[in-house]
């Protein structure tokens, strides 16, 4: 599969990036992964996405090793390392560091009409538990609706990736709310306890835009 490696900085952290052409993927490419047999029943797109993400992770791990696949599909990082992987379209990103919360997500900016169709399943329009309406916060940001909505979607994905190693349970979009959104950061607040994390605990994420993609990152050293 044709790939190109690069890196950039977000929130002072190095993000490792792979751009790839899924059309050039072959089954033989997958043999590079020690766990390739676990992907034998996956579709072609899933295999290409997974491979690109693991290549990004390989660079994040100083080209020393590759994360395997956990029972819930999560990456298995080396002992003492926390990391995160994401892919969207022809872009894959990965980041890792020692013993901290870390979660990254990349998403293609969702078209406005589609965003409005699905917004009720992602953001809340009702006030609850003394937290402001998410829809109101997105509007107050001054960002175009489709960008603000995609950031909310992506940020929740990043947060859930970061919390999962400790929470070890499924989290819905309603588990966290956007309580602030600026030109480069976003704050999410938990709407319920997710032990060891508590209700109303807030997390700050950083974001950037690369062409038609957004990348959100939580990286709590």
What spans do the regions from the language model cover?
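Core catalytic alpha/beta fold that binds nucleotide/phospho-ligands
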Residues: 1-221
């Amino acid at each position: 599969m044709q790939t190109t490696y690069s890196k950039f900085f977000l929130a002072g952290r190095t993000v490792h990036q792979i751009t790839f052409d899924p059309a050039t993927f072959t089954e033989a490419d997958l043999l590079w992964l020690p766990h390739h047999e676990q992907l034998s029943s996956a579709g072609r797109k899933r295999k290409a996405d997974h491979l690109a993400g693991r290549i990004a992770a390989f660079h994040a791990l100083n080209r020393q090793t590759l994360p395997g696949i956990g029972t819930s599909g999560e990456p298995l990082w080396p002992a003492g390392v926390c990391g995160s992987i994401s892919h969207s379209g022809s872009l894959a990103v990965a980041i890792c560091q020692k013993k901290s919360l870390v979660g990254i997500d990349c998403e293609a900016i969702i078209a406005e009409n589609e965003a409005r169709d699905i917004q009720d399943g992602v953001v809340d329009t009702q006030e609850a538990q003394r937290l402001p309406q998410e829809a109101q916060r997105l509007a107050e940001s001054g960002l175009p609706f489709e960008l603000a909505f995609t950031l909310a979607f992506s940020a929740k994905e990043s947060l859930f990736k970061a919390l999962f190693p400790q929470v070890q349970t499924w989290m819905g979009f309603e588990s966290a709310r956007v309580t602030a959104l600026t030109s480069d950061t976003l704050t999410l607040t938990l709407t319920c306890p997710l032990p060891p994390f508590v209700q109303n605990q807030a997390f700050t994420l950083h974001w950037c835009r690369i062409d038609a993609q957004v990348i959100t990152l939580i990286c709590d050293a």
